[in-house]
């Protein structure tokens, strides 16, 4: 086994798979006629792990177990264990319900349980849905509620959601009727005032009304090419009874409604009298009641068709540091790859990672704000680096995050000097 150490270039060994030399990797493992580096071994392990998970995802009756679904979600989404469990059970029951419906002679009809995901911005709602799309064996589509309008007005009809599901199933109607739909930004279609309005609200309450029958179960007429319906056009008939709907939204301001309701009931010596700003948004969301959603602007019929409620928490400092470093597509790994293309190593100190997480918490943008902070820190370095020679390493320390100081640049000459001095 060769380790990363200096030596004669004539005796330099190279990985037979990626071509990197023994000086560019931590370990180089030798076979009879070939060599493999530690990075290629890790890549092979990831490939085998994915294959094993996909083959063992289903239990004996063909239904993925909630624990299996949750384990796969854990690989990509940090934290949010409660929301993962709710989603895993809901998807598992969706599969079981479909299998139960196919069995003849059953007197009990299992109703579906659509899901509402509520959490502050950047906490992982959309990522959970995208990860589900990768691991499920049913057609899956995501729709943006902000683009929807009532039928007859400029914008997308709600039937376009089903069209996207049909496209995901390659126009196989039977498969589409067993699919899952995720509607994002559902908090943006709330009615504009708490009282019913005389004027039509075509992008708010009107969309909620249009989604009601679709979510409950109806036969939707879908134009195969999309667009508006024309009398001459043939429609595809899609039964939405067995389609699972997951709705998600940040619901900005809902925490204030919950806190206001809590103030009215806080009396006596044992009452919790902490100010609402002392409690996180995620903590307040755990006390959510249907009446809060009605006050926010959802109509009662819409809330009634979303019986399963999962609230996501604010991400704390440890979770944000983990998001920066651990997932397969972690931000730190992405920027390290960018710097590798300039033949430069990028390193972050532990204190720097914690400082980045603190800045994201102060901005209240969750994990979504991490990239803008990283761009801000590395902007000048990325601007100057392509024009500089002999820079082998860039180190981001705490000062580079908390002040105007630049990341430390280590030059090849300095490394040689320290090596000879040693």
From Swiss-Prot:
ATP binds at residues 120-127. It comes from the Bacteria. GO terms for cellular component: HslUV protease complex. Zn(2+) binds at residues 15, 18, 37, 40. InterPro entries: AAA+_ATPase, ATP-dep_Clp_protease_ClpX, ATPase_AAA_core, Clp_ATPase_C, Clp_protease_ATP-bd_su_ClpX, ClpX_bact, P-loop_NTPase, Znf_CppX_C4. One of its GO terms (molecular function) is ATP-dependent protein folding chaperone. The keyword Ligase does not apply. One of its GO terms (biological process) is cell division. Residues 3-56 form the ClpX-type ZB domain. Transmembrane segments: none annotated. Pfam families: AAA_2 (PF07724), ClpB_D2-small (PF10431), zf-C4_ClpX (PF06689). Keywords: ATP-binding, Chaperone, Metal-binding, Nucleotide-binding, Zinc. PANTHER family: ATP-DEPENDENT CLP PROTEASE ATP-BINDING SUBUNIT CLPX-LIKE, MITOCHONDRIAL, ATP-DEPENDENT CLP PROTEASE ATP-BINDING SUBUNIT CLPX-LIKE, MITOCHONDRIAL-RELATED. Belongs to the ClpX chaperone family. ATP-dependent specificity component of the Clp protease. It directs the protease to specific substrates. Can perform chaperone functions in the absence of ClpP. Component of the ClpX-ClpP complex. Forms a hexameric ring that, in the presence of ATP, binds to fourteen ClpP subunits assembled into a disk-like structure with a central cavity, resembling the structure of eukaryotic proteasomes. This is ATP-dependent Clp protease ATP-binding subunit ClpX. It comes from Ruegeria pomeroyi (strain ATCC 700808 / DSM 15171 / DSS-3) (Silicibacter pomeroyi). The gene is clpX.
